[in-house]
Amino acid sequence: NTDVSLRVEEMENTDSFKVSGRGELHLSVLIENMRREGYEFAVSKAEVLYHTDENGKKLEPIETAYIDVPDEFTGVVIEKLGQRKGELRNMGVSNGGYTRLEFSIPSRGLIGYRGEFMTDTKGNGIINTSFDGYEPYKGDIQYRKQGSLIAFETGESVTYGLYSAQERGTLFIGPGEKVYSGMVIGQNGKTDDIELNVCKTKHLTNTRSSSADEALRLTPPKILSLEQALDFIDTDELLEVTPKTLRIRKKILDSRMRKRSMMK
């Protein structure tokens, strides 16, 4: 490793490594480089490095976020950063119909936020951050308000199964793709995870309806980039990276074991 700002530690499980870097962009560049070199691996959601004080109290890194945003998007930015434990420290008028915001926010509150910020501001917002120091832990953050659509069976996705599934949310796959139990195939429109069978075919009958021959229309799937996939995955999910594909999966693939772990 020639990158002095990158630290790699072997975990107790010899199949996994803990990789520490300078932020999401730094780690995503490493992932993309490894992918291009032919590696296949899985990554978890990025985490910050915590410290403890002399009394054993948990401390976390805090950053100052400087934001310039068109006036009409000020409300949504303040709301989203508030949900991520951000505290508005300053607010003023900037040039050309822009508002300048200054937030104090935990570093983990910014994980996965920049893509969301660009969407919320229609690409017109500017965000810069600087490290402030370590402060007492601010409490849990809910990174995602929408749950996942999870494949229930292993097989190949078919139009009929996907047609039923797309009513539940946004799909990440189209027909003819290999799926396996525990694989995330889309984003739910609601907060909870839903298991779906996208491999199911329509039962054949002797009767025909007037619309029997009409092709089922599927909404084109949302194809996630590496950055979008890293932003999307939740703490109980992994991103599988191969030279040709990106797949999101639950850490625990078995449905029963997954539900059992959630009850603990």
Where are these regions (language model features)?
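Accessory interaction regions appended to the cores of large information-processing enzymes
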Residues: N1-K264
